[in-house]
């Protein structure tokens, strides 16, 4: 689960490397984000020629979490790292490439563009 101050890797080619969660969107009671949830984050580390510079506040969707979570069919899945993809104002990915696998739950949340860019969907 991703909560405030959780640091995540960035799984796209916007140039940002690490982001830190500031807030989880979806109501005042929502404290933790799962796969497919949108968060507000601050870019903590980026490459010099990045689209998302260090210190900027961005929206991102969580695509991988390390905590095992159950699927409706009874299976569990977990990933090796916490990762997110940076979004633009239209809730589409800002980058043009996605690195690493992403979870199938993004299809339910209508992030089909991320699924089509991803090399592997688990």
Curated annotation (Swiss-Prot):
Upper lineage: Bacteria, Bacillati, Chloroflexota, Dehalococcoidia, Dehalococcoidales
Its biological purpose: Binds to 23S rRNA. Forms part of two intersubunit bridges in the 70S ribosome.
Metal-binding is among the record's keywords: no
Domain of life: Bacteria
Gene Ontology molecular-function annotations: large ribosomal subunit rRNA binding; structural constituent of ribosome
Subunit structure: Part of the 50S ribosomal subunit. Forms a cluster with proteins L3 and L19. In the 70S ribosome, L14 and L19 interact and together make contacts with the 16S rRNA in bridges B5 and B8.
Record-linked Gene3D superfamilies: Ribosomal protein L14 (2.40.150.20)
Cysteine pairings via disulfide bonds: none
Protein name: Large ribosomal subunit protein uL14
Family classification: Belongs to the universal ribosomal protein uL14 family.
Keywords recorded for this protein, A-Z: Ribonucleoprotein, Ribosomal protein, RNA-binding, rRNA-binding
GO biological process, one term: translation
InterPro entries: Ribosomal_uL14 (IPR000218), Ribosomal_uL14_bac-type (IPR005745), Ribosomal_uL14_CS (IPR019972), Ribosomal_uL14_sf (IPR036853)
GO cellular component terms attached to this protein's record: cytosolic large ribosomal subunit
Source species: Dehalococcoides mccartyi (strain ATCC BAA-2266 / KCTC 15142 / 195)
């Amino acid at each position: 689960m991703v909560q405030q101050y959780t640091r995540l890797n960035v799984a796209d080619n916007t140039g940002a490397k690490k982001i830190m969660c500031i807030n989880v969107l979806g109501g005042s009671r929502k404290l933790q984000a799962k796969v497919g949830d949108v968060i507000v984050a601050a870019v903590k580390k980026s490459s010099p020629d990045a689209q998302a510079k260090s210190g900027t506040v961005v929206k991102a969707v969580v695509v991988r979490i390390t905590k095992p979570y159950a699927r409706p069919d009874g299976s569990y899945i977990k990933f090796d790292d916490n990762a997110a993809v940076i979004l633009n104002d239209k809730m589409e990915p800002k980058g043009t490439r996605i690195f690493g696998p992403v979870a199938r739950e993004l299809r339910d949340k209508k992030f089909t563009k991320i699924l089509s860019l991803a090399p592997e969907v688990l």
